[in-house]
Amino acid sequence: NPGERPDIYGKIGNAGVSICCLDDLKKLYSGFELANSMTSVSMTINGPAPMLLAFFMNAAIDQECEKYISENGLENQVQQKIERIYKNKGVVRPKYQGELPEGNKGLGLFLLGVTGDEVLDNTIYQKIKTETLTKVRGTVQADILKEDQAQNTCIFSTEFALKMMGDVQEYFIDNGIRNFYSVSISGYHIAEAGANPISQLAFTLANGFTYVEYYLSRGMDINEFGPNLSFFFSNGVDPEYAVIGRVARRLWAKAMKNKYGANKRAQMLKYHIQTSGRSLHAQEIDFNDIRTTLQALYAIYDNCNSLHTNAYDEAITTP
């Protein structure tokens, strides 16, 4: 628990919500149906991405277990099992602190402190798990190469981080996780560190092809992992940004088709745009909305798949 570490206590929450265990993530997403087809969760996490992704998947599975328990009237039976588990452990069961927000019915909190496989028959649990993994939608950033190059939130060696990325992708393939992007290959941070549009695109595509080569070296099929790759670019007001997405898509598709023999689905480059944070000023702050609007217009005309526009006060404080 980072709250017990005096050397890092002051950093908690500086870059997002603090999640140090499965129960933390269950509390965070309580009330949201993570396996619903209308729910898609994007996690901007890199160094500890495999662990956070595991928390997320298990939280989604346990939510579906809770729904099964409720639909089959097993609440009392399961509650008794949980009480026995904690009596044997001799510790206090974790609980949600405070009142639930309006509209939150507490989905995800009934199994707080335990997991579905501890309270349900293994056959039932495995069926729920298999179905849930094919339904979850979202993205985890997990791009370790751009961390080395730009953002520097590295907690493992590059070699070990790449191995974990490969492990995650193999798990996605083996378990039929088709609606979740295992990596968001990111140029945004490279641009924020000073790269121009051309350099941003060059580094980002180079990183993408590095992942392709590495996954292929581990025996994975390009048509199975290709659809799990996504991209993330910055957008400024330089003229090259008007076509960065189209150029990226053409280069990626040609290489995936001609060099790697990928099918049409694996040739598709899906990308998210975030308007440029470093282009916004604390002094002439009234111009920030204009800058962001122009950048968003570039992105829309370039047919981005999704778009994030930065806040008016981005240059002053954490959004």
Where are the model-predicted features located?
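Flexible, glycine/threonine-enriched loop-and-boundary segments that flank and lead into catalytic domains
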Residues: 253, 276-287
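Active-site-adjacent loop and "lid" segments of alpha/beta metabolic enzymes
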Residues: 198, 285-295
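Extended amphipathic alpha-helical segments enriched in small hydrophobics
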Residues: 242-248
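Surface-exposed loop-to-helix/strand elements on domain peripheries
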Residues: 270-279, 311, 317
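Catalytic alpha/beta active-site cores
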Residues: 1-235, 240-241, 259, 266-272, ...
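Active-site or pore-adjacent capping/gating segments
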Residues: 294, 305-319
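Amphipathic alpha-helical scaffolding segments
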Residues: 228, 250-251
